[in-house]
């Protein structure tokens, strides 16, 4: 990635992540990304694969590396006052419904990811899956990005989100 102009959001963590990977972080608007890749204003991007398919980025970007670094969440939120007003039985029902929702959404999300990746692979010149040794280098950039961005996020919130994703080892390295 050395020297490549890599599209980032304005997230300080993503900016440092791309910089740690050796590319030149280039904050660039999502709605302009297709044209940016097409014209060479940006030469790469770090976007979850199904969104790349939805935005048809595979039409202008032909090389893909699968690093498993993107996560998308599907959440349910409720006002604490309303939640606290529920009876124990109502909370039990709510938790059961939320668990069922979570399972179904994960199932649908996984199918969406697979469909998007399959469509991209059909037109990509290359879909590369790094070796475990190569993944260690990708992960090192991520750890450095989080450390470099300290002070720009709430540590306890970040820790909880990462732990909920099963990233205990990653959190331990931070």
Model feature map: region roles:
Residues 2-174:
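N-terminal secretory/targeting leader peptides
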């Amino acid at each position: 990635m050395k020297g490549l102009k890599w599209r980032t959001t304005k997230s300080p963590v993503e900016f440092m992540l791309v910089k740690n990977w050796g590319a030149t972080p280039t904050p660039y608007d999502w709605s302009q990304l297709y044209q940016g890749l097409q014209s060479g204003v940006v030469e790469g991007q770090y976007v979850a694969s199904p969104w790349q398919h939805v935005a048809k980025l595979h039409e202008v970007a032909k090389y893909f590396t699968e690093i498993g670094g993107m996560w998308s969440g599907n959440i349910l939120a409720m006002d604490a006052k309303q939640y606290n007003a529920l009876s124990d039985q109502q909370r039990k029902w709510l938790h059961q419904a939320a668990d069922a929702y979570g399972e179904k959404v994960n199932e649908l999300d996984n199918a969406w990811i697979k469909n998007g990746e399959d469509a991209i692979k059909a037109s990509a010149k290359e879909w590369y899956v790094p070796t475990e040794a190569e993944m260690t280098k990708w992960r090192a950039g991520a750890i450095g990005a989080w450390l470099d961005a300290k002070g720009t996020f709430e540590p306890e919130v970040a820790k909880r989100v990462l732990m909920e994703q099963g990233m205990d080892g990653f959190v331990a390295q931070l």
